[in-house]
Amino acid sequence: MQAQKAEGTRDLIGAEMRAWQKMQQIAAGVFEPFGFKPIETPAIEQVDVFVHGIGQSTDVVRKEMFRVFSGANLERVFTEGTDIKLKPKQRLALRPEGTAGVVRAVVENNLVPQGSTPFKAYYAEAMFRGERPQKGRLRQFHQVGIEWLGAPDPAADAECIIMLMEFYKRLGFDLSKLRLLINSMGDAQCRPAYREQVKQFILDHADEMCDECRERAELNPLRAFDCKNDHCREIMAEAPLMGDNLCDECREHYEQVKRYLDAAGIEYVEDPTLVRGLDYYTRTVFEVEAPGAGVGSIGGGGRYDGLVELEGGKPTAGVGFAVGFERALLALQAFGSDLGADEAPCVYVANAGKELRQNVFAITQELRAAGIVTEADYQGRSLKAQFKQADKVGAKLILVLGGDELAAGKVKVRDMESHDEVLVDLANVVEAVRERL
């Protein structure tokens, strides 16, 4: 049987791999001038990192998180099932998102901001969720994101959004085709009472709503705003709104965020029903949609002022966002653009006989040492076949070394497009190639 990749995963090959690399390069170019430095956390974390951070009642933890078993524990799973009792350090999961792991790393490595020095980091990593595979929704996907700890001021919320929109611009998006949604989810002071209002509203309309919304009424009532059932959405349009229940501090924080965005010329739409699927969010939340692209949200984030404490650290403000690579790429393509990075011009070095391979080998090493992408024949092809191979790999130049050229200390350089040929000194081959690329 032919080996196949797991369902809901993709191989990043060729143009897609170059696109992922380009997104990472753009991320560094946008985020580092703002003071953010790269971070990488393990793909495997203890389950409690996500249970405490994302929330036990969220769909991510309850339905989508991949559990990891190894060694003897895997044998027990086969015989006893997945509900086997394990020590906390043995209860492992693949990361479904980036924020909780970064915060865990900050707490564990004693990097929690002290005084006026914040912690700023960005990441570009694979995430894993056990969702039903479909367009823009994979079981292994990639995200670029930032985390900013120690910044309680609403200016930090606005700056994150400004960075996010600049990132989309650098990716090649026409920002007029994107829609930025913002809302406030309140905080630990005002949200519990609002949560109870929404819960009661759902219970009052339980006979008209889907099974999932009825279940959410007890576990996570705010998630009912995200229901895809059209009838449920019509009902939830009449539900109480967080904006009408914000405490004075949360309302002022939200108003200041909007003033900063207005001053920066950032266009946004207030969506009073916008909620994020993770429990750690507080106050400002935001999402970016690409209407017409057919992929839904292509990124989002918000404030999470209680997450560091949930992961065992001191109370610390935090804000961040993440952008999905696969969805962003699909949206770009839907708008007639792409993220494929241009490949460096290639040079092909051909030989006119097996006895010249050692000399060709030396030329290829010299060109590669100079940073020039170079291919050569190692399969004993004829000179005609080598020309065909040079065309196949997209070489801009082909260097042909024959016995006469070698005796004269020369090599023939041919432009594959114009077919112009010139003899150049072997001693100056790097400079000659660079001039023609």
Protein language model regions, located:
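TRNA-recognition modules of translation machinery and tRNA-sensing kinases, especially anticodon-binding
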Residues: 1-437
